[in-house]
Amino acid sequence: VQAQPIQPFPPFVELTESRYGPMLYPPRDQYVGRSFKEYGEFSQGELDIFVQILSPGAIVLDIGANIGAHTVPLAQLVGTGGVVVAFEPQPVLHQILCANLVLNSVPNVLTYPMALGNCEGECKIPVFDYSQAHNFGGISMDMVEEGESIPLGKLDSFQLDRVDFIKLDVE
């Protein structure tokens, strides 16, 4: 029996070293993935502003966390005395987000694979072929009749005592 080479990641995920640590990303994503592929980061200008606003111990919501391009640095910024609560409804992006948290040894993030809205239940999102070029973060749940069912929740149901900062990147 001859050994077969092991492919370390699925073909729709690549690994790069960013200024915040190693990050997995979908190289076919036209925005977040493309930015990681070319620069090793995404929207650094936004993160530069967050650094001026946030301090250790802060409670942060990352709504539309995608692969964690902001989640990882936000968690590092607020430190172990703070917490980031991250919401990402797309199952594949949520899995990459969780993998990036593990890769960067980030213990102060709670992730939820769900969308947020004004009611609780389920909604549908489009199903992507991650081997094809697309804006994977640019989905709309408005007029989707077919697709993958995902949980829909209300932020109020989390009964958070306080929130210091909300990063919101949703369609």
Model-assigned labels for residue ranges:
Residues 1-171:
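Phosphate/nucleotide-binding beta-alpha loop and adjacent structural elements of enzyme active sites
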